[in-house]
Amino acid sequence: MSDDHYIPTAKHGLTPEPGERLARPLQRFAKLSSSGGIVLLLMTAIAMIWANSQYAESYNEIFNETKTTIAVAHMPDHAASGHDDPATYAADPHDSEHTEDHSESAIQDATHAIQKTVADGEDGHAEDSHGGHGWKPVTDEPMWYQQHSTAMWINDLLMAIFFLVVGLEIKREVLVGELASPKRAALPIFGALGGMIGPALIFVAFNYGKETIGGWGIPMATDIAFAVGILAMLGKRIPNSLLVFLTSLAIVDDLGALVVIAVFYTENLELAYLGYAGTIVAVLMFMNVLRVRWITLYLVMGLPLWYFVYMSGVHATIAGVLLAATIPAHARVNAVNFVFSTRKALDVFANAHDDPETAVTESSERRAAVTAIMHNSRLVMPPLHRIEHALHPWAAFVIIPIFALANAGIPIHGGIVENLSDPAAIGIILGLFIGKPLGIAVLCFLACKIGIAALPKGVSWRHIIGAGILGGIGFTMAIFIANLAYANDPSHLEHAKLAILVASGISAIAGGALLLTCKSAPEPEPDSIGPLVDDDDDD
């Protein structure tokens, strides 16, 4: 049941505002299970068209050539003491008036240090962007800086937020979801193992002894947004238990991909930075043990964790998963306390002595009651759930589409057949389209045969095979691993990305077509309570 079923609508005497009416189509689209996949597909198409059009040079310039620097400058002594130090600072020859205060001078000094870094070590003092006022530091070298292309910032920093969401989903599933029960978890776990082993073996068979062998982890991945989106578009033909199975399988698959990235695609480890990262994780775990539920503190601690993981040589996105593992999963108050305190607040709200038409902001009693209800609602939701709920739309509709735009722009030089004749491309296509469904079906069959798992109610083996084919939609995670595997080999990287797109497209069409031949799923029994309002009335 959607959370939005409890939002008051016209049926409750609430007339939609003009802005709400305009936003309604977008809100309804965002509620669709397939919406994330549709946006992802659209951005992929834009990237491909852009990279192969007359504007291809601008695509490469924006994402690969443009460098962005984040820097922390040395702060001058006088910024702290309030006195200028002539041994450290030289007067600007263009400066005719020294009327700016010390705080502005400090800001200008920091700005010059950053400008100096971006200029790649250019000698001399740069002109001040505010007309040359203030003092200039003799030494412009910043205390710390990181300079990367736009694509690298997206892949290393922005995707860490996506992996935080993935980590939260994994933790939730393990604690209270399908993976919490060993019996229910067995089938998706075995399916995911088969879906990782099968593609990897096929890739190795075509690339053993070749320079492309490092890409063996590419076809192991499954894109949840695409695969689940296609299942959702098939509607009533698909039993809900199959949707749960594929989602759980993809989550276990993501966990396997994270292990592969951390273990096999990490080259030079810096143990000191790894130790710093471990210390922060230990502090976060201790905060969890102490029942600290201040979400902001966890997220702030995630920033140095990201930096230390990045500097350690392990891929920086692993920091998102580590942070997710430490987020508290238990609420501050239980359901009984929530109901009691909220009813009390509602009684205060209903029995307020003000005129019923008085605005809440003008009534101290009602304002206090609403504040109490908001506070109770926050305490009854675990921090894990609150962060996941807040970040999921950003991951689905902002981060992943931006990632697709920055990484799916593959210039096709020569014919498509020529590009796909690369052993890496062959291994990826066959691994995703053949190895995925074969591995999933075989290990699921073995798990059922030996009695440690059973098919969900309403799910047939044709459903399992169809879902396995949809598991061959690698896309996001596959492209991510390809960037790591062929980071120093642009030619093979382009071939690998093209192969991922081709294999994902074939898997989507074939899997959807097979599932369309399945009998419609039986209608679910109506909810004993049912929604308070109809979906069509949601705003």
PLM regions and their residue ranges:
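Entry/N-cap segments of selected transmembrane alpha helices
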Residues: E173-A200, E270-T279, I412-G435, W461, ...
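C-terminal ends of transmembrane helices
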Residues: A23-Q27, L164-A180, V228-P239, A282-R293, ...
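Structural signature of hydrophobic alpha-helical transmembrane segments
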Residues: M152-F163, E211-A225, T266-T279, T317, ...
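Predominantly late transmembrane helices and immediately cytosolic-facing juxtamembrane segments
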Residues: D3-L32, M48-N52, N288, W294-M301, ...
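Transmembrane alpha-helix boundary signature
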Residues: W50-I62, H74-A79, V165-A180, I197-G217
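Low-complexity, proline/glycine-enriched hydrophobic segments characteristic of transmembrane helices
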Residues: A56-H148, S341-A369
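Hydrophobic core segments of alpha-helical transmembrane domains in multi-pass membrane transport
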Residues: V39-N52, F162-L168, G198-F203, I280-F286, ...
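Functional cores that coordinate and move charged inorganic groups
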Residues: L231-D347
